[in-house]
Amino acid sequence: MASSLPPNVHISKHPCLRAKLSQLRSKSTNARETKALVHEIALLLGTDALSYLHLEEAGKDETPIGYEYTFETIDCSKITLVPILRSGLGMVEAVQTILPAPVSVHHLGLFREKLTLQPVEYYNNLPQSQAKVAKLAIIVDPIIATGQTCIAAIQSLKEWGVEKVIVLSVLGAIPGVTSAAAEWPEGTEIWVGGLDEGLTDKGMIKPGLGDIGDRLFLTLGK
C-alpha cells in the first residue's frame, strides 16, 4: 500500500498507535475513551511528524546541582495550529503538549454538504495581517475521507501565505488522502495513523471509525 502512495504521505508504523487505533474503531468505545484515544494517537503521530523541526541553541543555563549546560529550544513564533472544527479540537492539546512553547491557534470551520460531499466554509479566523502569517501551519483533523475538506484547508493556508503545511489525521481513506496530497505537494506533508481502502456512498470511511465528531461530542443520531 505504502509504495503506491504519494511521497508526501506518511503512515505511522508505531505499534502502540496501531493498537490504540483498533480500540478507537470499536463501537463499544465510549465518549470519554474516544477523547483520550484521539489525544494519545495525536501525541504519537505528532511526535513523528514534527521530528524534522530545527533545534537551536539559546544560551546557557544551570542544573539544580550547579552544572552549566547548553539550553536548546525550537522557535515556535512562526508555527500555528489549525484545527478543523469541530473534531479537530480533539487533537489540539496533544500538539500543544509536544511543542516546547505556546503557538497560535487559528480555527477553520468546514463542513461537508450532504448531497455533493463538497466542503462549505462557515468560519475562518486566520489573521488578515501579513505580518502574522506563519511559516508552518499544522492542520489537525481526525479524519480524511473524501479529502475535500483537507484540500479546502490547504488552499486557505496557501493563499494566506504559509511556507509549509503539515496535516495530522488519525485515519484516512486512500482516495481522499491521495487527492489531498496532490493539492500542494511541494508544500504539504500528510501524516496519518492508518489508512482504509475506500468510502461508503455517503462519503464515510470503511471500515473506518464512524463519525468521530459525533463520538467526541455525544451528538450521535442528531
List where the protein language model places each region.
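PRPP-associated nucleotide enzymes
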Residues: M1-K222
